[in-house]
Amino acid sequence: MGKRLISQNRGRGTPKYRSPSHKRKGEVKYRSYDEMEKVGKVLGTVIDVLHDPGRSAPVAKVRFANGEERLVLIPEGISVGEQIECGISAEIKPGNVLPLGEIPEGIPVYNIETIPGDGGKLVRAGGCYAHVVAHDIGKTIVKLPSGYAKVLNPACRATIGVVAGGGRKEKPFVKAGKKHHSLSAKAVAWPKVRGVAMNAVDHPYGGGRHQHLGKPSSVSRNTSPGRKVGHIASRRTGRK
């Protein structure tokens, strides 16, 4: 009897395939959307900048005027001791948080909410930013890094600027060990071995005197889990 496929082991949910979220610094999101932000602004001071394992951007610990502390994504150019503003009357300056409806067109933004008050869901990776493209009655159009223009509620909040940590991909890993330690902070099994390079006991495409599939690559949607590899329920394969 053959061994279980990687996809089957992943479904079991062993520690190897689970994200080590216990190593993270904490929840990174905006403060609650209260009346102070809806009618004015709240001041906060950056008291520390932290490395968060598994995240591509640094996070800052911010202490607000009411004593509340939050972990937030910081933009390029912000350092310890600087002040940020959150609210409808905040200044248009990197690091400040405003509703999309109050941000002028063409300004780069990140950590965008999809529902007002959800804490920020879009554009959170290091070096990323979106652009406010247009405003209309009851909606704001934002161009995401993918090029997709998304229509959002003008009350959704966003941060002015570009997420810190850009250019991280320009430096090569050089050593396999560095890559291993980097991906061990995420739910990524690395290195990724091809099925044809495995033994017959490990994968349906494994074994043989040379690397080849040895069977059709298309499989049914209802195929048993141990054989469900390749093109699953494909309408067509190969070049068009």
UniProtKB/Swiss-Prot annotation:
Compositionally skewed regions (Polar residues) per UniProt: 1-11
InterPro entries with a match to the protein in the record: NA-bd_OB-fold, Rib_uL2_dom2, Ribosomal_uL2, Ribosomal_uL2_arc_euk, Ribosomal_uL2_C, Ribosomal_uL2_CS, Ribosomal_uL2_dom3, Ribosomal_uL2_RNA-bd_dom
Composition bias type Basic residues, residue spans: 13-26, 228-240
UniProt keyword list: Ribonucleoprotein, Ribosomal protein, RNA-binding, rRNA-binding
Short name of one Pfam family: Ribosomal_L2_C
PROSITE patterns linked to this entry: RIBOSOMAL_L2
Cellular compartments per GO CC: cytosolic large ribosomal subunit
GO biological process: cytoplasmic translation
Region (Disordered), start-end ranges: 1-26, 206-240
Highest taxon in the source lineage: Archaea
GO molecular function: rRNA binding; structural constituent of ribosome
PANTHER family, per the entry: LARGE RIBOSOMAL SUBUNIT PROTEIN UL2, RIBOSOMAL PROTEIN L2
Role description: One of the primary rRNA binding proteins. Required for association of the 30S and 50S subunits to form the 70S ribosome, for tRNA binding and peptide bond formation. It has been suggested to have peptidyltransferase activity; this is somewhat controversial. Makes several contacts with the 16S rRNA in the 70S ribosome.
Subunit structure: Part of the 50S ribosomal subunit. Forms a bridge to the 30S subunit in the 70S ribosome.
Family: Belongs to the universal ribosomal protein uL2 family.
Protein name, UniProt field: Large ribosomal subunit protein uL2
Protein species of origin: Methanococcus vannielii (strain ATCC 35089 / DSM 1224 / JCM 13029 / OCM 148 / SB)
Source lineage: Archaea, Methanobacteriati, Methanobacteriota, Methanomada group, Methanococci
Chain's gene name: rpl2
